[in-house]
């Protein structure tokens, strides 16, 4: 299991909270993080929305199972265009984050949470994009 935190830093950004930034250049396709997870069976997934942990769960597989990522990965914010993708590593029980593009030092790491803008605003407090 690899932890590549020397490439990253966490900063507090007004209006967003904690955010993960590249501390140095990260090449497209590079493994950025491989964080351990806590598995949450699908049968318990309805309860996560009723706790503060609910904002930090990720889809683990196609069977509606979830996981809590233990590391910087849980602090990566929603944003478009996203610059990292997620891969569930079932063998090592880790969530892996890969660079979708070259990421410059100082850029925030972002991925698409996959929710509609109403849910992003209501649940996560992310403002809806401006309508032209």
What are these regions (language model features)?
Residues 1-132:
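Conserved catalytic SET/PR domain of SAM-dependent protein methyltransferases, capturing the structural core
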């Amino acid at each position: 299991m690899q932890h590549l935190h020397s490439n990253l830093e966490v900063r507090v950004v007004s209006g967003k909270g904690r955010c993960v930034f590249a501390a140095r250049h990260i090449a497209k396709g590079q493994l950025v993080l491989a964080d351990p997870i806590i598995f949450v069976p699908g049968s318990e997934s309805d309860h996560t929305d009723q706790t503060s942990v609910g904002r930090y769960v990720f889809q683990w597989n196609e069977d509606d199972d979830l996981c809590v990522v233990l590391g910087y990965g849980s602090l990566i914010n929603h944003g478009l265009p996203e610059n990292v993708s997620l891969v569930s590593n079932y063998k090592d029980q880790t969530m892996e984050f890969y660079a979708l593009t070259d990421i410059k030092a100082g850029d925030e790491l972002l991925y698409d949470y996959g929710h509609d803008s109403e849910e992003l605003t209501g649940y996560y407090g992310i403002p809806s994009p401006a309508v032209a």
